[in-house]
């Protein structure tokens, strides 16, 4: 099969590549390959089964059209300071300009016009003052919250728009390899387990998301595509009562706090805050169970959850950060019999495990009821655990009650975007004809910045004709 552009991965980066080409009037043939299912066929059975059933061949939360982010929460960060290192490659001004442009596209397809995190100047100053006292930095970032259920409708509208405008989509097909001729990428080989296909194209865009970060890292090694080990984030999902987070939830919606706690001074940050939200489980390759969180526009819980992530940057000779994070996750899963572990913060400080009956005695009712009470410190590396404990205690200055005895910590929370593919400002890799976008490229983190990268890629291809 021949095409002008083949896009591997139907997450925000891949979607916005195709979307921008169409908006620029390009008539080039676009083929999109996605190993998951279309939006309308993505359903997590846990709502009925009340526990994860390890869907095969892939978890519907992490795989399919719109990627993992849209099914976890659907938050669009509207500041270039949030979402990865892409601004260092393309420049802050272009990054912010394209964020504003992509945001308008989301609005066109039905995103809520309300923006969280604006106004409340005096209360924002008070939160910042507390953060400074605690040795933390508060990052200003307005948020457009689509919500898990609303995001699905928005991406369904985008999916249909792309199909109506001639984009060919191959769902259930996985990319097995690149097609190379004389050190030039000519396309991809794909398979659905029964049928093998080869798609030849002038431009091959790989945008496989966090789910595909490990696969892309191996591909780079196999084909000698210039890349470098990047950062991997290891942490926990914290859950507290809404009353504890009331001021931050109302004023900021999402508190973006960054610190460098002693003694290691690694970067530790909050991420993906969900007021009235729900803790969730995602399954990656080899049934690796990872915790996440999401919130709906309408359905609300009594709790707020957010992740606390510790960034790891390894030095020579170690160059397998993704494998390292996976091992941490596997060990935690082993202790929890394949499930997510949950522990009270006070029990961690007391050096004891948490028992299921103790959870029932707390003010907090876990929103991930099948998480197994236990001891996350038995699997979490000392460095990461120390950083997390010290960061939570610093957070208590900003949000009194955050470090309460009954505060819940779920593990493991892992972010697989560590491989950094070396590219120029037009997203050309060292392999001619190949472009790598989104979280799997190591340059972005989250829906909006991946959308920005796709927009710029689509614009460039359309201009070339």
Region spans (language model):
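Dinucleotide-binding Rossmann-like beta1-alpha1 core, especially the glycine-rich loop
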Residues: 56-57, 64-117
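Extended, charge- and Ser/Thr-rich helical segments
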Residues: 102-108, 118-121, 127-136
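Residues forming the flavin
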Residues: 1-83, 124-129, 134-465
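Short catalytic-loop micro-motif centered on adjacent basic/acidic residues
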Residues: 114, 118, 204-207
């Amino acid at each position: 099969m021949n095409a002008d552009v083949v896009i591997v991965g139907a997450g925000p980066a891949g979607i916005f590549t195709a979307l921008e080409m169409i908006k620029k009037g390009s008539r080039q043939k676009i083929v999109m390959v996605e190993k998951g299912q279309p939006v309308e066929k993505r359903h997590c059975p846990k709502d009925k089964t009340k526990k994860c059933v390890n869907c095969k061949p892939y978890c519907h939360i992490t795989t399919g059209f719109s990627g993992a982010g849209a099914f976890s929460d659907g938050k669009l960060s509207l500041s270039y300071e949030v979402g990865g290192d892409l601004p260092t490659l393309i420049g802050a001004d272009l990054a912010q300009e394209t964020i504003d442009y992509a945001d308008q596209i989301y609005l066109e397809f039905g995103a809520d016009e309300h923006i969280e995190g604006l106004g409340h100047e005096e209360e924002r100053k008070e939160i910042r003052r507390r953060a400074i006292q605690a040795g933390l930095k508060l990052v200003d970032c307005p948020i457009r919250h689509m919500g898990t259920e609303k995001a699905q409708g928005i991406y369904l509208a985008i999916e249909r728009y792309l199909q109506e405008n001639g984009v060919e989509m191959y769902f259930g097909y996985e990319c097995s390899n690149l097609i190379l001729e004389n050190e030039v990428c000519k396309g991809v080989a794909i398979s659905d387990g029964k049928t093998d296909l080869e798609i030849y194209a002038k431009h091959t865009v790989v945008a496989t998301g966090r789910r595909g970060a490990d696969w892309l890292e191996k591909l780079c090694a196999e084909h000698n595509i210039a890349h470098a080990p990047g950062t991997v984030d290891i942490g926990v999902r914290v859950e507290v009562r809404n009353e504890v987070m009331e001021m931050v939830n109302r004023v900021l919606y999402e508190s973006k706090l960054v610190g460098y706690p002693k003694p290691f001074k690694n970067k530790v940050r909050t991420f993906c805050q969900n007021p009235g939200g729900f803790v969730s489980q995602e399954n990656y390759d080899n049934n690796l169970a990872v915790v996440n969180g999401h919130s709906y526009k309408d359905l609300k819980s009594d709790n707020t959850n957010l992740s606390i992530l510790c960034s790891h940057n390894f030095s020579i000779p170690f160059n397998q950060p993704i494998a390292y994070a996976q091992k941490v996750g596997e060990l935690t899963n082993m202790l929890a019999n394949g499930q997510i572990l949950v522990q009270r913060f006070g029990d961690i400080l007391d050096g004891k495990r948490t028992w299921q009956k103790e959870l029932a005695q707390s003010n907090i009712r876990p929103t991930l009821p099948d998480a197994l009470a236990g001891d996350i410190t038995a699997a979490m590396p000392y460095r990461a655990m120390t950083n997390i404990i010290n960061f939570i205690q610093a957070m208590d200055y900003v949000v009194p009650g955050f470090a309460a005895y009954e505060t819940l910590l779920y593990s493991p929370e892992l972010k697989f975007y560590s491989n950094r593919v070396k590219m120029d400002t037009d997203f050309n890799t060292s392999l001619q004809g190949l472009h790598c976008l989104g979280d799997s490229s190591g340059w972005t983190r989250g829906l909006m910045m991946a959308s920005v990268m796709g927009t710029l890629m689509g614009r460039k291809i359309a201009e070339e004709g």
